[in-house]
């Protein structure tokens, strides 16, 4: 039996008491009120970190709204792929997680860059302020938006049976044909009563219309524009290199950051010593393999720079500075090779060195020996003498503690950029 999504309903329309609103979000909403602009929360959780809080605002007000929210501690993320949305992010005051405000100057029917419905002004005019001081879209409009959103999220996004009043039924009929709103309301009622067959059939007909795709030339032009972040507002991303011997927890940290950071994350491998068993014979000719590796590293670092330009956080899984850590006295040829590798890629904003005793790293992964791992540990720590942007993190902590510490480092580094 299909029922309305309680989480969706609570997040979109639940008011609750003022203490249920996160203090950083309350400050942001107070800043909007102080501006005197119209705004309305569309969906999102207000009482906890994590997830986006979608807020409707007029496009003409964005120029004033964004600086006002920045003044409360948010930072605008550069996100060309999400335009015309504006994404603002902050680490919450207690350093327990992230908050994201997604400002919507248009109402997209079926997800990002889908067909827009010209009802935003009407929704703002009909919005209601709750006992907690938060302005939300009216309940009737909320149920219609949830039905339309089902083309993107599925029938589980329903919050109630839409009623045939307000601006949205007419907008639905204008886009999907006369009678579509009535059919949608009836199908939603049946779905919430336990039979969603009619709703699923209706959504199959609605989806291609609401997700209207531009022509191939327009799509290709948009991809190029997004990749170059052409005239995209917001702050560019940052790059962190995650370093440490085997068993320090590099992979676990990178995967955890990719899952938890609300900024788009790109992972690039810039290690220099990984062997390739499928390497063709011609690459084993002296000098050829090195040239291929240098070109590969340069290409990966160039893509990483583009990712940063687009506002993404780049995580380097290892880095070419590993060339400094080779033990023993290298030959002249090796010194030349290591020097070329070392200068093949720019340094990241921060080197994160995961530090743990050799015995602990051996116990975790069982590779090499405790003595070898301890020697490599010391070589990584020596990077502090060469670079002033090395941060050593205690990797004897549990994985979640390490991740939270580095999340805070990401925030401090990114929010300090100009």
Where is each model-derived feature located?
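Conserved lysine of the Walker
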Residues: 250
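Hydrophobic positions on the alpha1 helix immediately C-terminal to the Walker A/P-loop
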Residues: 253
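Conserved substrate/cofactor phosphate-moiety recognition/catalytic segment
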Residues: 258-298
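Glycine-rich phosphate-binding loop used to anchor ATP phosphates in small-molecule kinases
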Residues: 286-345
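A glycine- and Lys/Arg-enriched "phosphate-lid" helix/loop adjacent to the NTP-binding pocket
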Residues: 321-382, 391, 396
């Amino acid at each position: 039996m299909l029922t309305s999504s309680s989480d969706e309903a609570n997040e979109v329309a639940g008011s609750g008491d003022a203490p249920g609103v996160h203090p950083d979000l309350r400050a942001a909403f107070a800043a909007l009120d102080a501006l005197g602009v119209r705004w309305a929360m569309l969906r999102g959780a207000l009482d906890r970190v994590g997830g986006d809080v979608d807020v409707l605002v007029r496009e003409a007000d964005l120029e004033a709204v964004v600086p006002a929210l920045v003044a409360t501690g948010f930072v605008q993320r550069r996100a060309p792929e999400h335009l015309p949305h504006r994404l603002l992010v902050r680490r919450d005051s207690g350093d327990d997680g992230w908050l994201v405000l997604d400002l919507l100057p248009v109402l997209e029917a079926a997800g990002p860059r889908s067909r827009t419905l010209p009802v935003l002004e009407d929704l703002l005019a009909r919005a209601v302020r709750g006992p907690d001081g938060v302005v939300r879209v009216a309940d009737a409009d909320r149920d219609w938006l949830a039905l339309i959103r089902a083309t993107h999220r599925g029938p589980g996004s329903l919050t109630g049976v839409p009623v045939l009043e307000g601006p949205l039924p007419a907008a639905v009929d204008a886009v999907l044909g006369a009678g579509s709103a009535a059919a949608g309301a009836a199908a939603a009622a049946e779905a919430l009563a336990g039979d969603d067959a009619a709703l699923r059939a209706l959504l199959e007909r609605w989806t291609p219309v609401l997700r209207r795709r531009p022509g191939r030339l327009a799509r290709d032009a948009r991809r190029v524009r997004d990749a170059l972040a052409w005239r995209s507002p917001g702050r560019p991303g940052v790059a962190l290199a995650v370093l440490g011997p085997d068993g320090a927890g590099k992979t676990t940290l990178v995967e955890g950051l990719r899952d938890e950071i609300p900024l788009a994350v790109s992972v690039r491998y810039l290690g220099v010593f990984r062997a390739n068993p499928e390497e063709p014979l011609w690459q084993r000719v002296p000098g050829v393999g090195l040239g291929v590796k240098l070109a590969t590293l340069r290409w990966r670092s160039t893509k990483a720079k583009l990712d940063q330009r687009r506002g993404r956080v780049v995580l380097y899984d290892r880095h070419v500075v590993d060339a400094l850590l080779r033990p023993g006295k290298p030959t002249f040829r090796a010194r030349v090779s290591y020097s070329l590798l070392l200068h093949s890629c720019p340094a990241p904003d921060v080197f994160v060195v995961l530090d743990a005793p050799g015995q602990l790293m051996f116990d975790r992964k069982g590779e090499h020996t405790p003595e070898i791992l301890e020697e490599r540990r010391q070589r990584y720590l020596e990077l502090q003498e060469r670079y002033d942007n090395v941060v050593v993190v205690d990797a004897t902590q549990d994985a979640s503690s390490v991740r939270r510490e580095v999340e805070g480092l990401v925030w401090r580094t990114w929010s300090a950029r100009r």
